[in-house]
Amino acid sequence: MVEKEMHLRVKAKKSEIHKVEALVEKVCDAYNIFHSYFGNILFSVSEAFEFAVAEKGKELKYIDLFFESRPNGLVFKVSLGDHFLEVAALFEKEIDQQLEKQEITESERSVVMIRMLADEVNFDSQLELLEMVFYITSINQHLTRERIRLLDAYFEKLKVTKIV
């Protein structure tokens, strides 16, 4: 179930990256996503955009970016057009195999980074889209654990025993 959607169409030029970054920032502000998770999302979506520009920027005038909010997380999609099958094939290789290579191409580096930072990477073959899913439910769990740790440390300094 999609809760919220956004669409952004930008020229297939690297100089349009600021519009992509603005979309990510707007979404992350709306969902109170900050720090490293914001960085993961921004870097992944930016890499996917730059990857799409590098792979098909000369052939297409525009690249479409989509955002969806789903119960399990935030989804960003980037159109890949004619090069969809080539790009999907790059994502089939194991990350370890790509990292072990002596030399890694710019495209392979982008693929590795996106796969490492996104929680899920999928492809929509009908619409020729690269889909990156970022789970946001675990953010609250991480925050809760961090708060518990900080409170425990605080009470440890006060020498107050914790009642369980």
Where are the predicted features?
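Helix-loop-beta hinge of the Bergerat
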Residues: 3-33
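Conserved short strand/loop->alpha-helix "switch" segment adjacent to the catalytic nucleotide/phosphoryl-transfer site
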Residues: 22-49, 99, 103-104
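Charged, alpha-helix-enriched surfaces in structured cytosolic catalytic cores
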Residues: 15, 36, 108-112
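Conserved beta-strand-loop-beta-strand hairpin that lines the nucleotide-binding pocket
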Residues: 1-7, 51-164
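A generic structural micro-environment signature
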Residues: 16, 39, 127-129
